[in-house]
Amino acid sequence: MPLRLIFMGTPDFSVPTLLELVAHGHEIVAVYTRAPKPGGRRGLQLQPTPVEEAARRLGVPVLTPKTLKTEEALEEFRAFDADAAVVVAYGMILPQAILDAPKLGCYNLHASLLPRWRGAAPINRAIMADDAESGVMVMKMDVGLDTGDVAMAERLAITDTMTAADLHDRLSRLGADLMVRAMAALDRGGLQLKKQSEDGVTYAAKIDKAEARIDWTKPARAVLRHIHGLSPFPGAWAELAGVSENARVKILRCELAKGSGAPGEVLDDQLTIACGEGAIRIIELQREGKARMQATDFLRGVPLKAGAKFT
């Protein structure tokens, strides 16, 4: 029979799991998400999270507490009398009392193959580290940072064409299906848990904008993975030497290419750029204050020739 679930999530990544749980008949008794933030052109409108927008379309009660550590927050959580809580990129630490409240526990969907890439930015870090694969895992939560016992996992190969946005979307859909399967097993009493290994633990630190500048002295493959791991946000960038306005360019998608030259040197009229070893060809980019565009469109307005330089 369907479970009574509390859903806790915030960004776009979380929404498919919420929708799939509803589609498979589970009763979502409440949705917890982060409070709306100022948005719009002038920051004058409060913008609800993607999860809040989805929950309101479903007619599910939405809560946006600033903390879950008060007695009032705990009593409110307990009052929903949930069988379990499903947590997908909620963005707030759950205290032990909250974790203990649902009858069957709290279950988190994490976008990595734990224990690799515990923490805030597993999708970006997996690409930037040149990992061959990523994946999603469902774990029963404890008070540690992504240290809970693992219930289920699905793997996904990372290709050289994948950006962080591409991998995000693939894992979001894969994770939604995995959580549905996990809740079905939990409902049957057949969800088996396995402790995480203490070998191979790495931490996916939050992305800092200071990391975004491209180091052209690195090998082409490392440059490609750096670019794709930061696409679209915050966007890996370089500056076009000799350009007085809008010199900064975010590179959003590229491919490995043949060629050699001084790091950052433009090698031809197709935006092939030399790296410390090998070269990349830019496919998609964005100038400061402009919309993202294909490299071919950029070259119509800025006809770069061989010998130009990115720094």
From Swiss-Prot:
Signal peptide: none annotated. Disulfide bonds: none annotated. It catalyses: L-methionyl-tRNA(fMet) + (6R)-10-formyltetrahydrofolate = N-formyl-L-methionyl-tRNA(fMet) + (6S)-5,6,7,8-tetrahydrofolate + H(+). GO terms for cellular component: cytosol. Its EC number is 2.1.2.9. NCBIfam families: fmt. Belongs to the Fmt family. This is Methionyl-tRNA formyltransferase. The gene is fmt.
